[in-house]
Amino acid sequence: SRGLGDVYKRQQEGYPYAMFRVGLYLEKAVLGEAKPEEAFAWYTKAAMADENEGIFALGRCYKQGIGTEEDWDKALEWFGKGAEKNESRCLTELGLAYENGNGVEENPQKAVEYMTRAAEQDYGYAQFKMGDYYFFGCGPCLEDNKKAVEWYEKAVANEIPMAMLRMGDYYLYDYDSLNESEKAFAYFKKAAEYEWYNEGLGICYEMGIGVEDNETEAFKYYTLAADNGNVTSMYRTGLCYYNGVGVKQNYAEAYRWFTDAAGNENIGAAYYLGKMQMYGEGCTPDPEAAVQWLLKAAEKNNDKAQFELGNAYLTGNGVEENDDIAMEWFEKAAENGNEKALKITGRRRK
């Protein structure tokens, strides 16, 4: 195309930005097939000519192993050169490196310093990270929901979907007792426009929070989020199939989703997986395997799993029958408010 010819002409004339663009075209397969090694060579030329885009791209290549061997030392060297020029993405990369200990020793203080510099330049992702630093606490950023929200809102204004989800969670789970959960829906819906999902939008539709309740829509958004790897949504998708919420009841599908979620450490899913294996719901009964999943959930204080373990020891299903151990689990379940366990322990005490 004429535009591409202009880029080549300019790189031949020594325009550093054009060198970067040629590298980008080669990396992203604009010219046909991707040619990462050639892209790396052009990024190097642009970076050596002190072009900001080239500097960042070269650092990214060394970080991700694009067209060259992964090399954190060289990646940080180039990100450092960009940071000296106050390049926001390079500052952000240095912040992430110090946050996670990639190529350097973990240093929360430096992570915050670099991320603050990037965020103050109105760089959206850095603003999101600053929100996280204040929300979860990082180095000099003590937990401070007010400051976290200020940064998240700036990131939302810069169209960062992750910040939209954080703000949705902030209102949905009412971290500061504002009783404004209806505001969550708008943030979750906005994130969905960018195809970013967590369990929040499904919960809003299922519970009628900020929108009229709609189980079909709830199931739709749970599955979208689950397909994107959100573990809580995998669990909730399993619940929908198990209970017939927004979809026809299907134990086999419920079992599949609970398996995925439990494999990712979701405690509720571990309970349901154990329960289904115990009674053969959507699968072949396997009491021994069931006990292992129930134990995993029970040890995290899931009262239903504790009650089921009590039953298992009481009847010798999947374990050797033992009334004393059964009562221990019933007692633990009762302490966690399980009504069935309370009845059993109450009768025993009389």
Where are these regions (language model features)?
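Short, small-residue-biased leader/transition segments that mark boundaries at the very start
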Residues: 1-8
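Canonical positions in the second alpha-helix
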Residues: 9-10, 45-46, 81-82, 117-118, ...
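Hydrophobic face of amphipathic alpha-helices that form TPR/SEL1-like repeat modules
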Residues: 21-28, 55-64, 93-100, 129-137, ...
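Leucine-rich solenoid repeat scaffolds
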Residues: 324-350
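Short helix-capping/linker turns of helical repeat alpha-solenoids
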Residues: 12-16, 28-30, 48-52, 64-66, ...
